[in-house]
């Protein structure tokens, strides 16, 4: 009985480590420009979750490509564009942002992802919010 229990625990641990929990997750962001009168709250999806990584002890003897770790990043995404209300005529009022359709564990691609871990920025509006959002798919 103990052997069966131990084997099932090891199997569960192995499957849990092999599975990725990197999925599209709902995210609310606030967008404002200093020249515009209003702030927009945008509901979108981002890639978030856990990816299996390993930290090697012999880092001095490995090439740099072997030291990079997988992150939760976009597999498929599309861009949406919104118009920020209350902008003067000389300011472009459009803001484009990615919407995650599916995610994967992989190397961070700087072409479409911010790969630098920064200090937490404030994610709130400092200006009045406008209640409507115009979206344009690109």
Curated annotation (Swiss-Prot):
<dbReference type="InterPro" id="IPR029034">
    <property type="entry name" value="Cystine-knot_cytokine"/>
</dbReference>
<feature type="propeptide">
    <location>
        <begin position="133"/>
        <end position="138"/>
    </location>
</feature>
<protein>
    <recommendedName>
        <fullName>Thyrotropin subunit beta</fullName>
    </recommendedName>
</protein>
<feature type="disulfide bond">
    <location>
        <begin position="108"/>
        <end position="115"/>
    </location>
</feature>
<keyword id="KW-0732">Signal</keyword>
<feature type="disulfide bond">
    <location>
        <begin position="39"/>
        <end position="125"/>
    </location>
</feature>
<keyword id="KW-0372">Hormone</keyword>
<comment type="similarity">
    <text>Belongs to the glycoprotein hormones subunit beta family.</text>
</comment>
<comment type="function">
    <text>Indispensable for the control of thyroid structure and metabolism.</text>
</comment>
<dbReference type="GO" id="GO:0005737">
    <property type="term" value="C:cytoplasm"/>
</dbReference>
<dbReference type="GO" id="GO:0005179">
    <property type="term" value="F:hormone activity"/>
</dbReference>
<feature type="disulfide bond">
    <location>
        <begin position="51"/>
        <end position="105"/>
    </location>
</feature>
<feature type="disulfide bond">
    <location>
        <begin position="47"/>
        <end position="103"/>
    </location>
</feature>
<keyword id="KW-0325">Glycoprotein</keyword>
<dbReference type="GO" id="GO:0007186">
    <property type="term" value="P:G protein-coupled receptor signaling pathway"/>
</dbReference>
<keyword id="KW-0964">Secreted</keyword>
<keyword id="KW-1015">Disulfide bond</keyword>
<dbReference type="InterPro" id="IPR001545">
    <property type="entry name" value="Gonadotropin_bsu"/>
</dbReference>
<feature type="disulfide bond">
    <location>
        <begin position="22"/>
        <end position="72"/>
    </location>
</feature>
<dbReference type="GO" id="GO:0005615">
    <property type="term" value="C:extracellular space"/>
</dbReference>
<comment type="subunit">
    <text>Heterodimer of a common alpha chain and a unique beta chain which confers biological specificity to thyrotropin, lutropin, follitropin and gonadotropin.</text>
</comment>
<feature type="disulfide bond">
    <location>
        <begin position="36"/>
        <end position="87"/>
    </location>
</feature>
<feature type="signal peptide">
    <location>
        <begin position="1"/>
        <end position="20"/>
    </location>
</feature>
<feature type="glycosylation site" description="N-linked (GlcNAc...) asparagine">
    <location>
        <position position="43"/>
    </location>
</feature>
<dbReference type="Pfam" id="PF00007">
    <property type="entry name" value="Cys_knot"/>
</dbReference>
<dbReference type="InterPro" id="IPR018245">
    <property type="entry name" value="Gonadotropin_bsu_CS"/>
</dbReference>
<dbReference type="InterPro" id="IPR006208">
    <property type="entry name" value="Glyco_hormone_CN"/>
</dbReference>
């Amino acid at each position: 009985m103990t052997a069966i229990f131990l084997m099932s625990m090891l199997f569960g641990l192995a499957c849990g480590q092999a599975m990725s929990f990197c999925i599209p997750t709902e995210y609310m962001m606030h967008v404002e420009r200093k020249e515009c009168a209003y702030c927009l709250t945008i509901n979108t999806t981002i890639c978030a979750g856990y990816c299996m990584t390993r930290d090697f002890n012999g880092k001095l003897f490995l090439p740099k490509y072997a030291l990079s770790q997988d992150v939760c990043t976009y597999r498929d995404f599309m861009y949406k564009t919104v118009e920020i209300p209350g902008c003067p005529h000389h300011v472009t009022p459009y803001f484009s942002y990615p919407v995650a359709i599916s995610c994967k564990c992989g190397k961070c691609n700087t072409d479409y992802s911010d790969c630098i871990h920064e200090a937490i920025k404030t994610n709130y509006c400092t200006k009045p919010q406008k209640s409507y959002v115009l979206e344009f798919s690109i």
